[in-house]
């Protein structure tokens, strides 16, 4: 649970405009080119999504712990996954599997996506709700549940983003992806890679991309 911001952390937030600009400039240098993604990464105050003790590291390109064995992904990974999901198209309706602290949710909202997000850990989901309220981003539909099962009642989705590493692509999520839709997810156990899946009338087109490291995708609710 993120603690209330101290005066020092609040002051850091007030100065973070320049820091966020440097972060978005770094993302551009690392190949992120979609202006909607760059704008979203600049506009979302990442320091509101981490513990106050880590606020001064919020805009470094590192993953940070958020409690309960979970982490917030490094900014470049968030930007890369978001760009893969929406590049060359309107974001449409997106399912996020693994809400975490809500940062990826916030970035998706800022791109104009209609966001549904599912999280198995109730305590983490409560934290995400608080963080999103603090960032004045309250339009995502947050659900406590098993991400492997997706949200069939809200399907089909134009895009699905999974923020934990699966050993195999969950079949229910493939079923809930619209034809022409994209899914971005890490796959693997000890060795993981980011994958882009595109659903066509002929099936799934799969592209293996960057090596990554994510916490494992688990089933059930906690």
UniProtKB/Swiss-Prot annotation:
It catalyses: [protein]-L-isoaspartate + S-adenosyl-L-methionine = [protein]-L-isoaspartate alpha-methyl ester + S-adenosyl-L-homocysteine. InterPro entries: PCMT (IPR000682), SAM-dependent_MTases_sf (IPR029063). Pfam families: PCMT. GO terms for biological process: methylation; protein modification process; protein repair. It comes from the Bacteria. One of its GO terms (cellular component) is cytoplasm. The keyword S-adenosyl-L-methionine applies. This is Protein-L-isoaspartate O-methyltransferase.
């Amino acid at each position: 649970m993120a603690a209330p911001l101290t005066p020092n952390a609040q002051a850091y937030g007030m100065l973070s405009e320049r820091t966020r600009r440097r972060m978005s400039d770094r993302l551009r240098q690392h190949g992120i080119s979609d202006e909607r993604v760059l704008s979203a990464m600049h506009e979302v105050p990442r320091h509101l999504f981490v513990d106050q003790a880590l606020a001064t590291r919020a805009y470094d390109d590192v993953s940070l712990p958020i409690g309960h064995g979970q982490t917030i992904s490094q900014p470049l990974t968030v930007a890369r996954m978001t760009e893969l999901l929406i590049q060359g198209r309107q974001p449409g309706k997106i399912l996020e599997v693994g809400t975490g602290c809500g940062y990826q949710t916030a970035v998706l909202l800022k791109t104009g996506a209609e966001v549904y997000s599912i999280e198995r850990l109730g305590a983490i989901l409560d934290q995400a709700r608080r963080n999103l309220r603090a960032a004045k981003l309250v339009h995502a539909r947050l659900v406590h549940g098993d991400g492997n099962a997706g949200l069939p009642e809200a399907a089909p989705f134009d895009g699905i983003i999974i923020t934990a590493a699966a050993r195999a692509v969950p079949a229910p999520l493939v079923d809930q992806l619209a034809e022409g839709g994209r899914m971005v997810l890490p796959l693997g156990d000890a060795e993981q890679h980011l994958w882009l899946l595109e659903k066509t009338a002929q099936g799934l087109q799969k592209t293996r991309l960057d090596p990554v490291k994510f916490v494992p995708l688990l089933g059930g609710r906690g």
